C-alpha cells in the first residue's frame, strides 16, 4: 500500500470538535458562535499539527508501511483495522522523528530543514507529544484493551532505548556490541514490534511473527548506521557524516573503537562533534583502517541469512514475497 497522504493523517489527529464558550462570546460581543468556533477549530488544528504536516509533506521510504502490508499476506486482518494500524504507526514514527531531530541537533531531514528550525523547539515538541497521545486514543477503535497495553509496552521500550543511546553519546561511553544491539531492539524495533503485535491481535492466525521482526529491526539500524557514513543519498537527505557531528556511537564506530586499543583519535573526534568535512573524512579513514564498514556488511549478510532461514520455517513461500522484498532492500549491494 502506498504512503498515506499527509491530509489523511492530519484529519486523523484533529480534535473531534471545539468546546462551546457562550460566556466568552457574550462578553466579547460575538453572536455568530458557529462561525467563530469553526474558525477557531481550524486555526487550532493547523497550529497543533503544523510540524507534523510539514514532515509528512515529504515522506520517506515508508518501510514500516511496506512491512505491515507484507506481513498481512500471512495475518489477513480486516482492511479497516489494517489502515488504522498503518496510520497509528506512521503517526508515531513521524512524531518520533520530530523529537529525534531536536535531541540530535539535526539540521536536515529528508533533504529539507528540520521542523524545529521552522516552527521552534517548543511547538515541535508539543505537536509530537499530542500525536503520541492521539495515536494511543485511536487504538480503542480496535476494540481490545490489549491494544493499549501493547502500545504502552513498546513506547516504554522505545524511550528506554533512546535514553541509553543519548546517555552513551552525552557521557562519551562506548557500549559493547551486545549492549548496542539491545538498545536497537528496544528503540528501532519498537514500532516494528508494535505494528506486528497489533496485527496479530486482530488476526485469526496463530503465527508469531515477532522473532522475524526483531531481525528486521536490527538489520535496518545497522544498515542505517552504515549508510550514514557511506551513502551519497544519505548525505543529500541528512548531511555528510551526521553521526560523527552528533557524537553518536553507531555500529561501525563501536566496532572501530573496540577493535583498536589505540582508539583515542576516534573518541576525541566524537567528543568534538565537529562539522568540519576534513575531520569527518579522517574519521572515516580510521573506520576503514579497522575494517568496520566491511564488518557491517558481513553482519548484515549474516543476519539477513538468519532471517531468511526463519522466514522459510514459518510458512508457505508463496506468502513471503513482500518480506523477501524488504530483506532484499535491506541488503547492502
Curated annotation (Swiss-Prot):
Cofactor detail note:
Binds 3 Mg(2+) ions per subunit.
EC assignment: the record states 2.5.1.-, 2.5.1.1, 2.5.1.29, 2.5.1.10
Q: Where does isopentenyl diphosphate bind?
A: 61, 64, 93, 110
Record: residues binding Mg(2+) 2? 100, 104
**What GO molecular functions are on record for this protein?**
metal ion binding; prenyltransferase activity
Cofactor(s) it depends on: Mg(2+)
Q: Which Pfam families match?
A: polyprenyl_synt
On the tree of life, the source organism's domain of life is Eukaryota
The protein's UniProt keywords, in alphabetical order, are: Magnesium, Metal-binding, Transferase
- Enzymatic reactions: isopentenyl diphosphate + dimethylallyl diphosphate = (2E)-geranyl diphosphate + diphosphate; isopentenyl diphosphate + (2E)-geranyl diphosphate = (2E,6E)-farnesyl diphosphate + diphosphate; isopentenyl diphosphate + (2E,6E)-farnesyl diphosphate = (2E,6E,10E)-geranylgeranyl diphosphate + diphosphate
| PROSITE patterns (alphabetical) | POLYPRENYL_SYNTHASE_1, POLYPRENYL_SYNTHASE_2
**In which pathway is this protein known to take part?**
Secondary metabolite biosynthesis; terpenoid biosynthesis
Binding locations of dimethylallyl diphosphate = 109, 187-188, 221, 228, 238, 248
Main EC class the enzyme belongs to: transferase
Q: What else is known?
A: The 15-deoxyoxalicine B cluster is a rare cluster that contains its own geranylgeranyl pyrophosphate synthase (olcC), in contrast to other related clusters which rely on a FPP/GGPP synthase localized outside of the cluster.
Q: What is this protein called?
A: Geranylgeranyl pyrophosphate synthase olcC
Amino acid at each position: 500500500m502506498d504512503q498515506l497522504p499527509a491530509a489523511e493523517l492530519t484529519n486523523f489527529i484533529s480534535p473531534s470538535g471545539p468546546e462551546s464558550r457562550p460566556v466568552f462570546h457574550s462578553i466579547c460581543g460575538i453572536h455568530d458562535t458557529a462561525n467563530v468556533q469553526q474558525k477557531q477549530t481550524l486555526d487550532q488544528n493547523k497550529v497543533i499539527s503544523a510540524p507534523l504536516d510539514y514532515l509528512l509533506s515529504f515522506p520517506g521510504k515508508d518501510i514500516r508501511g511496506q512491512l505491515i502490508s507484507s506481513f498481512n499476506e500471512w495475518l489477513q486482518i480486516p482492511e479497516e483495522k489494517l489502515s488504522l494500524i498503518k496510520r497509528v504507526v506512521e503517526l508515531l514514527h513521524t512524531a518520533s522523528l520530530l523529537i529525534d531531530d531536536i535531541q540530535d541537533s539535526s539540521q536536515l531531514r529528508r533533504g529539507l530543514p528540520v521542523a524545529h528550525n521552522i516552527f521552534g523547539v517548543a511547538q515541535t515538541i508539543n505537536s509530537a507529544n499530542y500525536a503520541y497521545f492521539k495515536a494511543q486514543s485511536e487504538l480503542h477503535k480496535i476494540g481490545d484493551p490489549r491494544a493499549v497495553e501493547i502500545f504502552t509496552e513498546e513506547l516504554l521500550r522505545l524511550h528506554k532505548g533512546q535514553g541509553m543511546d543519548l546517555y552513551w553519546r552525552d557521557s562519551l561511553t562506548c557500549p559493547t556490541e551486545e549492549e548496542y544491539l539491545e538498545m536497537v531492539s528496544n528503540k528501532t524495533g519498537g514500532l516494528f514490534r508494535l505494528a506486528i503485535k497489533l496485527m496479530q491481535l486482530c488476526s485469526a492466525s496463530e503465527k508469531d511473527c515477532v522473532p522475524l521482526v526483531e531481525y528486521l529491526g536490527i538489520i535496518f539500524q545497522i544498515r542505517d548506521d552504515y549508510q550514514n557514513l557511506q551513502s551519497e543519498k544519505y548525505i543529500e537527505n541528512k548531511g555528510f557524516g551526521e553521526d560523527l557531528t552528533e557524537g553518536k556511537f553507531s555500529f561501525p564506530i563501536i566496532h572501530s573503537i573496540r577493535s583498536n586499543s589505540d582508539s583515542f583519535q576516534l573518541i576525541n573526534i566524537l567528543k568534538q562533534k565537529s562539522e568540519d568535512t576534513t575531520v569527518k573524512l579522517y574519521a572515516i579513514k580510521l573506520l576503514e583502517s579497522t575494517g568496520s564498514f566491511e564488518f557491517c556488511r558481513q553482519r548484515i549478510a549474516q543476519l539477513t541469512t538468519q532471517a531468511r532461514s526463519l522466514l522459510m520455517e514459518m510458512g508457505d513461500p508463496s506468502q513471503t514475497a513482500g518480506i523477501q522484498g524488504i530483506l532484499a532492500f535491506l541488503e547492502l549491494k
